[in-house]
Amino acid sequence: MKRTKNINQETFRKSWRSYRLAPVALAVSAVFMLAGCEKTDETVSLYQNADDCSQANPSQSAECTTAYNTALQEAVKTAPKYATREDCVAEFGESQCTQAPAQAGMVPTSSSETTAAAPQQSGSMWMPLMAGYMMGRMMGGGASQPLFTSKAPNSPANGKFVDASGKNFGAATTGRTMTVPKTALAPKPAVTKTITRGGFGESVAKQSSMQRSAATSSKTTTRSMGG
């Protein structure tokens, strides 16, 4: 009888510990569920210029202009740089390149307002013209990022909107709205060194491959969870 009593006491202690831990486990699960529900994406619109944005959003004309000018300034700092015009044209096509400003305060105009006919100067760098910009719809302060496109037939960025890191945002069509990670609107590092011909195209191809893999992985996870 004494042995049976000890066994019952041990069983009771295990049950009591399980009861005490249950609320803790539920609380931890709730924290992870809430973290998973936090918004990690941002709805953005893609435009070629401030006029396109203003026409689509008449009441936000000032915000459109601010976002456009911010993107132009970012383009100067973050666009890929080339040692020669030929290297830039090889990646982005004719009429898609301009000399990078020598002074930080200088901002190039968009591809619709600038030609690539400027003579090359000693020590200058070349960069693609900003072809459009991404504007966060719900974020204040004109949050935006410059977008580039290529007209070179063999470029993976041909006809696409890509950012300074080479990430692909689909067809270079103005007025599109899409959902992107919030990191897409985060500032990119300044580019002060030139890259070799074809280097940016390789970045675009690599980023596109990573995006496809991530999309496939997301679909697989959703199916496995019964989504």
Curated annotation (Swiss-Prot):
InterPro entries: Biofilm_formation_YgiB. Pfam families: DUF1190. Residues 212-227 have a biased composition (Low complexity). Signal peptide: none annotated. NCBIfam families: PRK11653.1. Belongs to the UPF0441 family. This is UPF0441 protein YPO0661/y3517/YP_2976. It comes from Yersinia pestis.
